[in-house]
Structure formats: structure tokens, C-alpha cells
Regions:
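Short coil turns that delineate tetratricopeptide repeat
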Residues: 30, 64-67, 101, 130, ...
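Terminal, low-structured helical/coil segments at or just beyond the last alpha-helical repeat
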Residues: 129-183
Length: 183
């Protein structure tokens, strides 16, 4: 009887213990990359810049060659710009444009970086003879930033008319509306 009671109590203890199958943790680099990017953004809000830079670098390493990587590199570049390292930011913005060249914000950030570095005129000379529509975007932005607003607006407007089906065209048109409203 004592054995029966001991076995019965053991069975009750096992069934009532709430035992469940152990949770399997799977590593998903893409999700982890977004997590680290979001942590970096939170560090930026808290003005903890070194930690933000490290989080963005981790996000880039976890997801090295995707469209999301362009976002991470842009965030890293904006952080470098904010703390006063435009040369490091330039590399990040150029990499972001190479990975995903259809985000107008990346071009604006790179143009601002060129202005900070003081190489706007040399970049305009380099881009003047290019036939690439993406180089025309950069040229128009640099012209506007250098003070030749009319020339830059014409360059970007011509691009919008020549390439109406580009995904970036609506963002360029919106930017042109904002620039012409200030004049």
C-alpha cells in the first residue's frame, strides 16, 4: 500500500507540475539585426553614441548584403555625422546607396556630407558628365546645396520627366515642391 501511495503521489506531482516541452531558441540573423538596429536607435535617443554605433555595426554584420543593411548603414552614417565624423559617414552613405539606391534620404544625407567635407564642387564636376539617373539625383542635390538652386531644380525636374517610372521619382518630386516653396 505504501508503494502504491508513493507511486500515486509521484504521478500526481508529475501531472500537476506544469511540465512542458523545452522551448527551442532558433537564431534568426535577420530578426536579430533589426533588434540591434532598434537598440541602436534607442541609444541615439538617449545620446549614448558609442553604444549606438556598436549596435548598428552588429546589425550590419548580422545582415550584411540586404536592403535592410542599407538602412543600418544609413543610421550608422547619420550617427557619425551627428558626432562630427563626416568622412566615416560618407563611406556609410555611399555603401547604403550601393545596396539600395532608391531611397532619396540616402542621397540627401550623402549630399550634406559632401557639403560638410567641402568637396561639393569636385563631386559636381565628376557627376556632370554621367548619364546615370542616380548620378543626376546627386548632381541636382549638390547644385541646390551649393546655391545654384534653379540649376539643381532643373536637373532634378528633367530627371523626373525622363525617368517617371523610377521608384524614387515621387520622393524627388516632393523634394522639388519643398525647395520651390522656399524660393
Amino acid at each position: 500500500m505504501k508503494k502504491f501511495l508513493a507511486i500515486f503521489l509521484l504521478l500526481i506531482a508529475v501531472t500537476c507540475s506544469g511540465y512542458r516541452k523545452p522551448y527551442k531558441y532558433t537564431i534568426d540573423a535577420g530578426k536579430d539585426a533589426f533588434y540591434h538596429n532598434n537598440v541602436g536607435i534607442n541609444y541615439l535617443k538617449d545620446r549614448i553614441y558609442y553604444a549606438a554605433i556598436q549596435e548598428f555595426k552588429i546589425a550590419i554584420q548580422l545582415s550584411p548584403n540586404t536592403q535592410a543593411t542599407a538602412i543600418f548603414k544609413n543610421n550608422l552614417g547619420e550617427t557619425y555625422t551627428f558626432i562630427g565624423y563626416p568622412e566615416m559617414a560618407r563611406v556609410c552613405f555611399e555603401d547604403a546607396i550601393k545596396l539600395y539606391g532608391l531611397n532619396f534620404k540616402y542621397y540627401q544625407n550623402l549630399a550634406e556630407c559632401f557639403r560638410t567635407l567641402g568637396i561639393t564642387n569636385t563631386k559636381m564636376k565628376e557627376l556632370a558628365n554621367s548619364k546615370s539617373p542616380y548620378d543626376k539625383i546627386m548632381l541636382g542635390l549638390l547644385q541646390i546645396q551649393s546655391g545654384a538652386i534653379r540649376k539643381g531644380v532643373i536637373t532634378l525636374d528633367d530627371l523626373c520627366n525622363q525617368e517617371p517610372n523610377l521608384l524614387i521619382t515621387p520622393a524627388i518630386r516632393q523634394y522639388l515642391k519643398e525647395v520651390t516653396a522656399k524660393i
